[in-house]
């Protein structure tokens, strides 16, 4: 009995530990107070704090794709950003130029770069290195521009808030050599792990969840200078608003089938949390309320005696928990059968021996 309980709690501890390891960081994102981090509409058009300074972010727009030939569905998005920013440098990084960039400027990371199982992971990590070295604004190819991005250049570091919590890496602006990005690239090897589910692997190793966890730790550090602050763009500045800087086109489809289930869980997190706790309590109740419930035995005087499930004389409800009684604890079959309250107690189903 004690051994069974030990294994039960041992595996329960393993499951809980794995859950905390996988979801502890993301769950903490729900408790972040964004008030001091939000980049609001009024802030963008009233940047007196930077009025006497030049733009912190250089006028460079970075995008990535496999080759120089991007899909037709994103040509409009790309053209909108180029046309609105004739004085910006535009760079489209390809798979070939991205790997060459890592090999030349960050050779210590090349082995890790090549080892990622999914190409989207390489596209994720290279944007962090590019923005750290050159600065500028990174946009996914499915992000078009509604207006000039000049007002955003006065904020040394900005990202956008994502749902249900955390930040995204599909739209980012950083000054060259920003220390937050240095912290990001230094942590990439530590988070490089294959979870065997494409969506979880990408999100945790290089994607938005990874970036959100690093940002959550970063914002707890002493903010000595405003230059180190990471601004989080409110949804009104991102899309679907007359203040929005961007327009979202049809996105890429790197998500696998597991992503659909994860998205469903995120949208119904309260239900799944309730079901998780309910399952846990049902298992605990079944173990302690039924399988380990003290069972009745018959004493020599014919009385029903309830003993502890840990007792060697306790006939358990499960055969796996059964304890054989010693030879000196034999029951009187004749007397037991004559007792009315024993009519529903099948002694023959127990593995105890009886005297004739």
UniProtKB/Swiss-Prot annotation:
The modification Phosphoserine is found at residues 307, 353, 355. The chain crosses the membrane at residues 4-24, 197-217, 269-289. Keywords: Endoplasmic reticulum, Glycoprotein, Glycosyltransferase, Golgi apparatus, Membrane, Phosphoprotein, Transferase, Transmembrane, Transmembrane helix. Gene3D superfamilies: 3.90.550.20. It is a multi-pass membrane protein. GO terms for molecular function: mannosyltransferase activity. It is an enzyme of class 2 (transferase). Pfam families: Gly_transf_sug (PF04488). It is found in: Endoplasmic reticulum membrane; Golgi apparatus, cis-Golgi network membrane; Golgi apparatus, trans-Golgi network membrane. Glycans are attached at residues 52, 146. GO terms for cellular component: cis-Golgi network membrane; endoplasmic reticulum; endoplasmic reticulum membrane; Golgi apparatus; trans-Golgi network; trans-Golgi network membrane. Its EC number is 2.4.-.-. The keyword Phosphoprotein applies. With imt1 and imt2, is required for the synthesis of mannosylinositol phosphoceramide (MIPC). Catalyzes the addition of mannosyl to inositol phosphoceramide (IPC). MIPC is essential for cell morphology, cell-surface distribution of ergosterol, localization for plasma-membrane transporters, and lipid-raft-mediated endocytosis of plasma membrane proteins to the vacuole. Belongs to the glycosyltransferase 32 family. This is Inositol phosphoceramide mannosyltransferase 3. It comes from Schizosaccharomyces pombe (strain 972 / ATCC 24843) (Fission yeast).
